[in-house]
A protein has these predicted regions:
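Intrinsically disordered or low-complexity boundary/linker segments at protein termini
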Residues: 2-51, 161-180
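Small/aliphatic-rich secondary-structure junction motif
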Residues: 35-83, 166-169
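A short acidic, amphipathic alpha-helical/loop segment
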Residues: 52-55, 122-126, 152
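Acidic, proline/glycine-rich short linear motifs
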Residues: 70-93, 174-180
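Structural beta-alpha unit
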Residues: 106-134
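Glycine-rich, Arg-bearing micro-motifs that act as flexible, cationic patches
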Residues: 139-155
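Protein-protein interaction modules outside structured cores
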Residues: 157-159
Length: 180
């Protein structure tokens, strides 16, 4: 009997969480002056890609942009359940620091944070405090992107009431261009 009660509670909790995730998150951007834009960037391994930097620069041209870069701390399911997220958070922080330095080198001021391992939850957490005007969501190309396989871009567009620009960053092609 106790096993049934525990399993029932877990199923109910998962159902409630799934229902909550289905509703679009209404964000309240902070009022800002004409010519200002708040850009939320969500990227993991692609956070340092040239294509993403170019998109951020393009979206912030001609305006005073406030940019928040969030790098989800992706972890293996086993490490997640064992509450062992230190390595994942440290790796995400390293990628984030390198990306912020690259953005600064091309004249873009941004701040960053390591987010939840679930990119949708990382977006929601950031939107609750940042109030973005738009989201730039960066992934690997199709066939190499776990986020595309899981439908993260489509789910984000359904879930959040903020315009989303999807940027595909092919890090291998960018490295070949540098070597070539």
């Amino acid at each position: 009997m106790p096993v049934f009660a525990v399993l029932s509670a877990i199923v109910f909790w998962m159902w409630v969480r799934a229902r909550r995730a289905e509703r679009p998150l209404k964000t309240r951007p902070r009022p800002h002056a004409e010519g200002e834009r708040r850009i939320l960037v969500i990227a993991n391994e692609t956070v340092g890609g040239r294509t993403l930097r170019e998109m951020i620069r393009e979206r912030s041209e001609g305006v005073r942009a406030e940019i928040l870069v969030v790098t989800p701390a992706l972890n293996s399911p086993l490490r997640h359940w064992a509450s062992d997220e230190d390595d994942a958070r440290a790796a995400a922080q390293d990628r984030l620091d390198a990306s912020l330095a690259r953005l600064a080198s091309v004249g873009l001021r941004a701040r960053g944070e390591v987010g939840d391992g679930d990119p949708l939850q990382a977006m929601e957490d950031a939107l609750r405090t940042f109030g973005a005007d738009e989201i730039i969501l960066s992934t690997h190309p199709e066939g190499r992107s776990h986020w595309l396989e899981r439908g993260v871009v489509a789910k984000a567009r359904e879930r959040f009431a903020v315009p989303i620009t999807h940027v595909v960053v092919d890090l291998e092609a960018e490295q070949e261009e540098v070597r070539g």
